[in-house]
A protein has these predicted regions:
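Membrane-embedded alpha-helical bundles that constitute the cytochrome b-like, heme-associated redox core
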Residues: 2-193
């Protein structure tokens, strides 16, 4: 009998491998959680409960997941720099390739800047980070009230920029995959060999 090892770990010329897919979808799911969690925590009175959890829980988890996302962004960048990418999908025109390249640049930049601005805000504001509600992380910058508001504003504005860039990315993929029926999304869909 022939052993089928399943999806390769590394990228192939025509599709992404298991590691690229895992990193891609992990980042997507966690950023989606961050947007939902941020909207709950900023609207929830501290003593109110949602699904049995109070506002502090959502803040602790938002900060903790942000640090996980920063780690995933670093892992993703290292993987991207050390593993060849698949070739461009043949359905992408030169202008579309330029758009994809710019979108990817923005996505990578935002994957780093969002967690960093969030971290700087909570540290400068003196709120700190209780990693997954277990242990307090040290504050290397100390309380800086003069610029915590600026960093918070930047963090929030960049969250909306990230939403726009993600929507543009998803829209382009859906246009190519669903409307034009090119099969483009199959390259990154999980559980596709």
């Amino acid at each position: 009998p022939r052993y089928d090892a399943g999806m390769p770990l590394t990228n192939l010329p025509d599709r992404y491998g298991a590691v690229s897919k895992l990193l891609h979808w992990s980042v997507f799911v966690l950023f989606a959680y961050q947007f939902v969690g941020a909207n709950i925590m900023t609207r929830l009175p501290r003593d109110a409960r949602v699904f049995g959890m109070n506002g502090d829980f959502f803040y602790d988890w938002h900060k903790s997941i942000g640090l996980v996302l920063l780690g995933l962004a670093i892992a993703r960048l290292i993987w991207r720099r050390t593993t060849p990418l698949p070739q461009w999908h043949p359905s992408l025109s030169e202008p579309e390739r330029g758009i994809v390249h710019r979108l990817e640049t923005w996505l990578y930049w935002l994957m780093f800047v969002m967690p960093v601005t969030g971290y700087l805000f909570v540290m400068a504001g003196g709120y700190g980070v209780k990693l997954f509600g277990i242990t307090d992380l040290p504050n290397p910058i100390g309380k800086q009230p003069s610029w915590s508001g600026i960093v918070w504003t930047l963090h929030v504005l960049l969250a909306y920029v990230l939403l726009i860039v993600i929507a543009w990315h998803v829209g382009l993929v859906l246009k190519k995959h669903v409307v034009e029926r090119t099969g483009l999304a199959n390259r990154m869909l999980p559980f596709r060999k």
